[in-house]
Amino acid sequence: MNDFGIKNMDQVAPVANSYRGTLKRQPAFDTFDGSLFAVFPSLNEEQTLQEVPTGLDSISHDSANCELPLLTPCSKAVMSQALKATFSGFKKEQRRLGIPKNPWLWSEQQVCQWLLWATNEFSLVNVNLQRFGMNGQMLCNLGKERFLELAPDFVGDILWEHLEQMIKENQEKTEDQYEENSHLTSVPHWINSNTLGFGTEQAPYGMQTQNYPKGGLLDSMCPASTPSVLSSEQEFQMFPKSRLSSVSVTYCSVSQDFPGSNLNLLTNNSGTPKDHDSPENGADSFESSDSLLQSWNSQSSLLDVQRVPSFESFEDDCSQSLCLNKPTMSFKDYIQERSDPVEQGKPVIPAAVLAGFTGSGPIQLWQFLLELLSDKSCQSFISWTGDGWEFKLADPDEVARRWGKRKNKPKMNYEKLSRGLRYYYDKNIIHKTSGKRYVYRFVCDLQNLLGFTPEELHAILGVQPDTED
């Protein structure tokens, strides 16, 4: 046994004594002598060559305390499990910012919000967000190779994996909903088993079946339980001969921002199809549809306003697009039909009722402002000026405080509130009155929506024209 406690010298390379260690024997070393290592600094007896590294010494001793399982290059399942645990943090961000679960429906801003989350999650630096100036459809259509060219180094594969995972989860959810709602009990009441078939069975009357892409627009926009809408997942097969001459399938115009085809088929009790309006994707698309707005001002539609997006999101709820029907009555008629008269001292236009009437989901900022403006007790801090639909924030901080309280946002202030108001400018919902501080005007067709003229509403509230310049 030598100084290093090695019994069998055949296990080490024949190098100079001062460099002997536990290295395995390699034939190449047999041809060299100790002069080969003369260029290296001298080593003390205690600082001998280290053992051949196994990689185990690089593992942290506290790895057992990690939340994620230990990754190994050969374990794809473990890697996938770890990535899913990391990606789950984005779901909370989606709820906070109102980002749709389906990446195909993302706006350009929501793509940016996803990348900002990844930048923070993976501590990325020098990320050029301008390279991803595209909406969700364009992002999903890039393909992996093109995506990796645009993505930051070293994390492109991870981001692509996350994107694929979200798309897959959305498709699986869509397929599950289709399975649950493809029974005959979920179709319109005028259809029975003798008139409509689903699946891949051959149509006996020769009507050609047409398949529609799975994970398409309708599944994320219209509730699957809507009794009068046929899901795009369902394969329309046949009607009996007696009805073939009177039945036609109509297609709704869809913004190019969305993939796939959109089939909406509505009928009345006699079996004759009627028109159905094309839904819009919330804040992602404010383009007006003629069929949806034929009784509205052509400039805008309050039905399109799903949320006010910002990095300080006003909405907690996910703003998935809703299947909105064109209103057939005014809000005033709607209230009267509900036999729900306005109580004394209460707002004439309750925001929650207005949200239900328009089908916008969570209460929106413009609806909340109308509630305050129709409440006599709020006239000390917000009121109509008496000039049409113009209104003034006499105490903008109080308005912001109440909006924050309604949406459970304690840090809400007028700066953030005004950011939401500015978002309405381009959508022709609300405009700022030039030359007047804290004065705004509704420029959409509120009269058709509410069923009140400005003068009628002012009379109910006892509003006097504002003579202040």
Swiss-Prot record:
Highest taxon above the source species: Eukaryota
One GO MF term attached to the UniProt entry: sequence-specific double-stranded DNA binding
Xref: InterPro entries: Ets1_N_flank, Ets_dom, ETS_fam, Pointed_dom, SAM/pointed_sf, Transform_prot_C-ets, Transform_prot_C-ets-2, WH-like_DNA-bd_sf
Alphabetical GO biological process terms: cell differentiation; ectodermal cell fate commitment; mesoderm development; negative regulation of transcription by RNA polymerase II; positive regulation of transcription by RNA polymerase II; primitive streak formation; regulation of transcription by RNA polymerase II; skeletal system development
Phosphoserine, modified sites: S220, S225, S295, S298, S301
Annotated region described as Disordered, given as residue ranges: 264-289
Biological role stated in the UniProt entry: Transcription factor activating transcription. Binds specifically the DNA GGAA/T core motif (Ets-binding site or EBS) in gene promoters and stimulates transcription.
Name under which the protein is recorded: Protein C-ets-2
Organism expressing this protein natively: Homo sapiens
Lineage, uppermost ranks: Eukaryota, Metazoa, Chordata, Craniata, Vertebrata
